[in-house]
Amino acid sequence: MDNTRMNSFLEYAICNRGTGAYHHLEQSSPSFPSCSGSPSSDTFHGEGAYGAGGSPVAAAHLPPQSPGFFPAPPGAPSLRGRCPERRVPNPKLQPRLRHHQLYLGQQDADAVYFQAAGYSSSTGPHLGSLAEGYCGAVGQYQQQQHLYGQEQPSYLPGVYGNLSPSLNEDKDPACPSEPCPNASRARTFDWMKVKRNPPKTAKVSEYGLLGQPNTIRTNFTTKQLTELEKEFHFNKYLTRARRVEIAATLELNETQVKIWFQNRRMKQKKREKEGLAPPAASRSAKEASEASDQSNCTSPEASPSSVSS
């Protein structure tokens, strides 16, 4: 088999991936794909083996090379027919490394997978010619990102610098001026001045009360209690005239007599409910029968005038 045809087949299979084979890299991050026997070139058309497939139309849609990269000097050795030598970066010059997983494309089932290290912008100018010769201008990833819908985060310091003002603007603004809680507490509204309940020391005429709320409990004497019990035995409810008369006799006021009768009636109802005292109806009927018996026994005899008549 002809080796020339085999080499051209390998070149076409590896490098002629179309515009989709470009990997979205940083401006300062060169990539090292697998070996290709094609020389580095500043143009994307010619042999058709430099990422654009030799299509002038595809090359026309690609943006110009990034100004951060410099072409290879004229006296640089040709890299055709041999693989580029992988260089290990100096950890002192570049302490931070970010690794990107790169695929040459999805058109072939046996797509070559490899891993390349991304370097900062300090090593970009030195390796720019080498990356440009094998993968084209790296600054084209932004255009391809919009063309093929591949969204990848940008790690460029300049992009972060541009985004930082917007991030600062997205932060919560300063707290608006609000009334201080201490000031609101110190402020007294008109509705707070209204007193819902009258004080205990209020005057009777001011609120129209029948008696003072802070009335002291009355301590009745034995004589007063005996007279009140006698009156309650005959009359459960007193008239106004009888209440005034009893109050004057017992040296009490009218309100004290009225309240005592109210409490005595409630006490009587409680006793009847508990069964400690007979109901008032049976007791009144019994008293009425006893009164009728007494009237019959003490009824006066007929007068002599009525008998003679």
Swiss-Prot record:
Transmembrane segments: none annotated. It is found in: Nucleus. SMART domains: HOX. One of its GO terms (cellular component) is nucleus. Residues 28-50, 264-309 are annotated as: Disordered. GO terms for biological process: regulation of transcription by RNA polymerase II. InterPro entries: HD, HD_metazoa, Homeobox_CS, Homeodomain-like_sf, HXA1/B1/D1. PROSITE patterns: HOMEOBOX_1, HOMEOBOX_2. A motif (Antp-type hexapeptide) lies at residues 188-193. Residues 28-41, 299-309 have a biased composition (Low complexity). GO terms for molecular function: DNA-binding transcription factor activity, RNA polymerase II-specific; RNA polymerase II cis-regulatory region sequence-specific DNA binding. Keywords: Developmental protein, DNA-binding, Homeobox, Nucleus, Transcription, Transcription regulation. Sequence-specific transcription factor which is part of a developmental regulatory system that provides cells with specific positional identities on the anterior-posterior axis. Acts on the anterior body structures. Belongs to the Antp homeobox family. Labial subfamily. This is Homeobox protein Hox-B1. It comes from Gallus gallus. The lineage of its organism: Eukaryota, Metazoa, Chordata, Craniata, Vertebrata.
